[in-house]
Design a protein with these regions (language model features):
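Class I SAM-dependent methyltransferase Rossmann-like catalytic core
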Residues: 4-21
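Conserved alpha-helix/loop element of class I SAM-dependent methyltransferases that forms part
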Residues: 19-41, 56
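Conserved catalytic/acceptor-binding region of the Class I
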Residues: 120, 127, 131-203, 225
Length: 266
């Protein structure tokens, strides 16, 4: 497979929007509408990507301003081009050092903080930005022990590119649920931490490799130039096809574990 730019491709990411949308909506379903009604407060979508969820947050909580924060200019350009609701705006920012311009009522983040090493130590600071009763809502993939992610390292060590990919590990490790519970409990009036395994239904050629190429596989691809980039991808895709075989009906089932955290500030 010939690969195009290794910049985070918004169109490739959105190709799997349906598979990624359900966890985002499940997380949103635990938010309290009363928080969104706080005068002078803002809902922040941290790691907003192309803005799909930011726009849904605005629909879910009419009257509340929503600000999407992301580090990718390409994603932000996509988000702005597809957003007409004037209550929704976007800004470039570093999630590791997030400082809100306006007081937050809800800090929402879908599949972003797993990219940041040491993210668990950032969460108490996020909680302290909230008023009493405000909510922190976070979802992160916790699939790093599954073949889809373990085989990234196998492929990285299996070719002439091994030296270039040494030390690249993709997403940061997402801890056991109890670790997040223990860190956030002292600051929380209410705290929910749970996991869900989604059976994602994919189709087409190399569907799991295509899926991960816009997320966890991306750092490996970015570290290589052609022709090694395509050769590495093909090696990974071959390994993945054995771990997640295509069924006779053309469907590939891709189990994907995700961690959810919803904390209400004490």
């Amino acid at each position: 497979m010939a690969l195009a730019s290794t910049v985070w491709d918004a169109n490739l990411y959105l190709k799997f929007a349906d598979a990624r949308m359900r966890p985002a909506l499940d997380l949103m379903g635990r938010l309290d509408p009363a928080n969104a009604a706080r005068a002078g407060h803002v809902i922040y979508d941290l790691g907003c990507g192309a803005g799909n969820i930011s726009r849904i947050l605005a629909e879910r909580f009419p009257g509340a301003p929503v600000v999407g924060i992301d580090s990718s200019e390409q994603m932000l350009d996509k988000a702005r081009s597809q957003t007409v609701d004037t209550r929704v705006s976007f800004a470039k920012g570093d999630l590791a050092h997030f400082k809100p311009d306006a007081p937050p009522s809800i800090l929402y983040s879908n599949a972003a903080y797993q990219w940041l090493p040491g993210h668990i130590d950032m969460f108490p600071g996020l909680m302290k930005l909230l008023p009493s009763g405000g909510q922190l809502a976070i979802q992160m993939p916790r699939n790093h022990e599954a073949p889809s992610h373990a085989l990234m390292r196998t492929a990285a060590d299996a070719g002439p590119w091994a030296a270039k990919l040494k030390g690249i590990g993709g997403i940061a490790r997402v801890e056991e649920p109890a670790r997040y519970f223990d860190v956030l409990k002292p600051l929380s009036a209410d705290l929910e931490v749970w996991e869900t395994v989604y059976q994602q239904v994919l189709s087409g050629k190399d569907p799991v490799a295509q899926y991960t190429s816009s997320t966890g596989l991306r750092p490996f691809l970015e570290a290589l130039s052609e022709p090694e980039r395509t050769q590495f991808y093909d090696t990974y895709a071959s390994l993945i096809a054995k771990a997640y075989p295509t069924r006779p009906d053309g469907i590939t089932l891709f189990p994907f574990r995700r961690l959810f955290i919803v904390a209400r500030r004490a």
